[in-house]
Amino acid sequence: MATLRDIKRKIDAVKKTSQITKAMNMVAAAKLRGAQQNMERFHPYAEKFNEVIERLAEGVEDAGQYVLLTPREEVKKIELVLVTADRGLCGSFNNNLIVMAERFLKAKQAEGCQVRLTAVGRKGGDYFRRRTFEVRKRMTGLLNKPSYEDAAVLGRELIEQFEIGECDEVYVIYSRFLSMVRQQATLMKLLPIAPAKKTEAEEKGRLEYLFEPSHEALLTDLLPNYVFIEILESLYQTAVGEHAARMAAMENATSNCKELVKTLTLTYNKARQAGITKELMDIVGGAEALKK
């Protein structure tokens, strides 16, 4: 049975752990506010850019002249970009993304496709480095402060790989931020580009645009930027999801520490009371023996 000193040592250790998790919760909350503001500012721009690309693509007579818009007749090579966090302590956040990626890669392999992985984030890269899948590239630090420059570097490389035939399709798995307590692992097809189509109700209310210069000239310039923007959007969403998941995990950990301290304190008091009772009984027993 644990001694009073052992129990007291455990209580002190749990209290120190609680202080650490509380501090990490506060740091995650501060980072979350900044990341969420950036995501919310960028999202309307990304949506409008997608709409422009859709309009331009509709006005082009021969979309086949654009490599980024043209599906391959036979898909044999798949590139997957997996976006995870660089650090842990965020619950099942990274695991959900990794599980989806592994299932996707295995499914494509079963179809006879050659699969390659670009790991954005240390956790995903570390996991697949120990597996049989080919990790073509690893990138870290992008979620600390997502930037257009970083997204463009990755996007240009993926576009080049697609144009020279090193991959027939490019997919991205990232965490879509739904709420403070819910983040959803999401699979997005990046290349070839297939702009989102408007619903019939949305089509009725939209205005017609006049484009200058021509649709073709604009598409040539804007299609690569569409890829960059989609990548940046996935980075923003995943960064916000990471901080929200870590804040929730640290809040739960702090709550668990408090409950454990209560339990240990109760155990400590019971053990101390039992010790005092035993000492009193020994004293009374000794006094009775002296009387005899």
Curated annotation (Swiss-Prot):
GO annotations of cellular component type: plasma membrane; proton-transporting ATP synthase complex
Protein topology in the membrane = Peripheral membrane protein
Tell me the protein family, please. Belongs to the ATPase gamma chain family.
Molecular functions per Gene Ontology: ATP binding; proton-transporting ATP synthase activity, rotational mechanism
Complex formation: F-type ATPases have 2 components, CF(1) - the catalytic core - and CF(0) - the membrane proton channel. CF(1) has five subunits: alpha(3), beta(3), gamma(1), delta(1), epsilon(1). CF(0) has three main subunits: a, b and c.
- Descriptive protein name: ATP synthase gamma chain
Q: Where is the signal peptide?
A: none
GO annotation terms (biological process): proton motive force-driven plasma membrane ATP synthesis
Organism of derivation: Syntrophobacter fumaroxidans (strain DSM 10017 / MPOB)
This protein's record includes keyword Cell cycle: no
What this chain does, per the entry, is described as: Produces ATP from ADP in the presence of a proton gradient across the membrane. The gamma chain is believed to be important in regulating ATPase activity and the flow of protons through the CF(0) complex.
Alphabetically list the UniProt keywords. ATP synthesis, Cell inner membrane, Cell membrane, CF(1), Hydrogen ion transport, Ion transport, Membrane, Transport
> What Pfam families does the annotation carry?
ATP-synt (PF00231)
Where does the record say this protein resides? Answer: Cell inner membrane
Q: Which gene encodes it?
A: atpG
UniProt entry tagged with the keyword Membrane: yes
* HAMAP family, per the entry: ATP_synth_gamma_bact
Q: Please give the chief subcellular localization of this protein.
A: membrane
